[in-house]
């Protein structure tokens, strides 16, 4: 399974990229707003760091297909690695159809049902982003959605890739891998958590203590 980092924070992106564990980045209007920087400025800097798919979303206030198509073309023109993130709506699907026909990669976001994922795939989406954590928040098993979409896409041979989103903890990542997600887009803090295990820490401390006992510092 491939990993993307889910953030617009350039420093976190650099740290994740330096580990060699990510091959893409996802952003959204909330993450961009959190940084308090110009969208194009942030995206251009991200493309200079990570050589892989970079998802940039149309403005949250753009709700019509015509507007999404216009903005999608502008986002795609920033860099060849750009992926246009489109919300799962009727107008969004119209935009995906047009953009995909022009060879522009799209990521349909805010997916909360298998039917939504199927519609997005039929419209030509490059990626679909089902949200685990937000489903878990309302007592619905988010991982079951990943499993359903993966099985359906396998049955019918869809090329659309599944990006598991709204990842809250390392257990989500493991579950997504087992459920068949192609990609997990993960906050940097969760990537850091994934590197840790108490037995690893104990093992390092033991090795260090044994070495010092014989050779000193």
From Swiss-Prot:
Highest taxon above the source species: Bacteria
Pfam families, A to Z: TAL_FSA
Localization annotation: Cytoplasm
Any one of the GO CC terms: cytoplasm
Major location category of this protein: cytoplasm
Molecular function GO terms recorded: aldehyde-lyase activity; transaldolase activity
Entry keyword set: Cytoplasm, Pentose shunt, Schiff base, Transferase
Enzyme nomenclature, EC number: 2.2.1.2
Catalytic activity: D-sedoheptulose 7-phosphate + D-glyceraldehyde 3-phosphate = D-erythrose 4-phosphate + beta-D-fructose 6-phosphate
An individual GO BP term: carbohydrate metabolic process
Pathway: Carbohydrate degradation; pentose phosphate pathway; D-glyceraldehyde 3-phosphate and beta-D-fructose 6-phosphate from D-ribose 5-phosphate and D-xylulose 5-phosphate (non-oxidative stage): step 2/3
Active site per database record: 85
InterPro entries the record matches: Aldolase_TIM, TAL/FSA, Transaldolase_3B, Transaldolase_3B/F6P_aldolase, Transaldolase_AS, TSA/FSA_arc/bac
Family the entry assigns: Belongs to the transaldolase family. Type 3B subfamily.
UniProt function note: Transaldolase is important for the balance of metabolites in the pentose-phosphate pathway.
Protein name from the UniProt record: Probable transaldolase
Biological source species: Agathobacter rectalis (strain ATCC 33656 / DSM 3377 / JCM 17463 / KCTC 5835 / VPI 0990) (Eubacterium rectale)
Organism lineage: Bacteria, Bacillati, Bacillota, Clostridia, Lachnospirales
Name of the gene encoding the protein in the UniProt record: tal
